[in-house]
């Protein structure tokens, strides 16, 4: 917020400086520099400051088999005599001039014809998974351009969780259709964990303490093993050299007598 406010204030200052008072103009008017001639946009300062994070590169679609922009919309494909219409009208009724909703409808219909046996059945579990997948990919394309859009990120995560539940249900009921949908949509199904526990602060500290205690016990065991190995080595050395200094003393006494 502070960065946005600083940008707006700097833009307002530059705008105030450019409005120079000219005494020759009637009523003490002010002369402005030609912003349009230089390619600058003095208006909508808040929008310029707030949307500075938007990626300028066009978001690339992840679907390799996107329909061409010259295809007609779904409502006008079966109209009689549509081929004799002027090219301008065809362009207005094509995907090139359509909105995002119409594009998603065309993509969903394309996947339904490719994967599902009955494309007209839109209430089945497979059809709902396809509709969710198309929506998820549109959210991903939007987030590639608008990286800080938290609302669409939340919608994306919720849709992914919902699709996981549907895929799990479909896998338990009809495995062949499940494999076909995963192959057609390019989905890699991962199994959920058998046990999940939320890592709060007390759990994390307890786990770190247990790991530290385990490491210290391993160090103590290693030292005990080293001491035992040293004691065993000393015993073996004594067995190899049976002449001890206690036995050597009486021999010297006998020799002296």
From Swiss-Prot:
GO molecular function, one term: structural constituent of ribosome
One biological process term in Gene Ontology: translation
Superkingdom of source: Eukaryota
SUPFAM superfamilies, A to Z: S15/NS1 RNA-binding domain
Annotated transit peptide: 1-57
Localization in the cell: Mitochondrion matrix
InterPro entries: Ribosomal_uS15 (IPR000589), Ribosomal_uS15_bac-type (IPR005290), uS15_NS1_RNA-bd_sf (IPR009068), uS15_ribosomal (IPR052137)
Chain intervals for the UniProt region annotation (Disordered): 225-257
Residues in the signal sequence: none
Pfam families in UniProt: Ribosomal_S15
Keywords from the named record: Mitochondrion, Ribonucleoprotein, Ribosomal protein, Transit peptide
One Gene Ontology cellular component annotation held by this UniProt entry: nucleolus
Similarity comment: family membership: Belongs to the universal ribosomal protein uS15 family.
Subunit architecture: Component of the mitochondrial small ribosomal subunit (mt-SSU). Mature mammalian 55S mitochondrial ribosomes consist of a small (28S) and a large (39S) subunit. The 28S small subunit contains a 12S ribosomal RNA (12S mt-rRNA) and 30 different proteins. The 39S large subunit contains a 16S rRNA (16S mt-rRNA), a copy of mitochondrial valine transfer RNA (mt-tRNA(Val)), which plays an integral structural role, and 52 different proteins. Interacts with METTL17.
Name of the protein this chain belongs to: Small ribosomal subunit protein uS15m
